[in-house]
A protein has these predicted regions:
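Conserved small/polar residues in nucleotide/adenosyl-binding loops
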Residues: 148-149
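A short helix-to-beta-strand connector/capping loop
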Residues: 2-3, 21-24, 112-116
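Acidic/polar active-site rim loop that often engages polyanionic ligands
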Residues: 113-114, 128-138
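Short glycine-rich or small-residue beta-strand-to-loop segments that form or flank ligand, phosphate
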Residues: 84-92, 118-121, 135
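N-terminal glycine-rich anion-binding loop in soluble enzyme alpha/beta folds
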Residues: 5-70
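Glycine-rich phosphate/diphosphate-binding loops that line cofactor/substrate pockets in enzymes
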Residues: 73-85
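Short Gly/Thr/Asp-enriched flexible loops that form oxyanion-binding sites at enzyme active sites
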Residues: 89-111, 131-133
């Protein structure tokens, strides 16, 4: 197996169990439900059935992307372990999250010049994004190297 981290955003519509079973790391987006902020922790803080029931009952919800500082801390934990990173973001067509990831990448490349961070725009969302991550996990598990992105 290759020694790089395959990573994405929590918006890939995969369960925590699936992320773990495929060895895919993820960073959590944020959302607000009726004025209260939550981390998109895959249904731990607010179970999905409660979330959708709240929407059904007229709750307002909005999302916010991961910021550059959050990406920096997230990526740095892997870099300290001597790992390169292939991070695939939610589509740039619906989110600016790729910009936050790129800012963190540029900052960390100065501190860890021996490590590589690859940021890829999935151009997808939801289940399509999740399927793409599964395909990348298959490639990684079959010897794909991060620099072959």
């Amino acid at each position: 197996m290759n020694d790089f981290i395959l990573s994405c955003c929590s918006t890939a519509d995969l369960t925590e169990e699936h992320f773990n079973s495929r060895n895919i790391s993820y960073i959590c987006f944020h959302y607000e439900l009726n004025g209260k902020e939550y981390e998109d922790d895959l249904g731990k803080s607010v179970p999905f059935d409660q979330f959708y029931l709240a929407l059904q009952n007229g709750a307002s919800a909005k999302t916010s992307q991961v910021n550059a500082d959050e990406f920096e801390h997230y990526f740095e934990s892997f870099l300290k372990e001597g790992k390169d990173i292939l991070h695939v973001t939610l589509s740039s067509g619906i989110s600016g999250v790729i910009n936050s990831a790129m800012i963190a990448k540029e900052t960390l490349e100065e501190r860890y010049p021996e490590r590589k961070i690859y940021i890829v725009d999935s151009l997808g969302a939801s289940s399509g994004y999740g399927l793409f991550m599964n395909r990348l996990a298959d490639l990684r598990d079959n010897g794909y190297r991060s620099e072959e992105r």
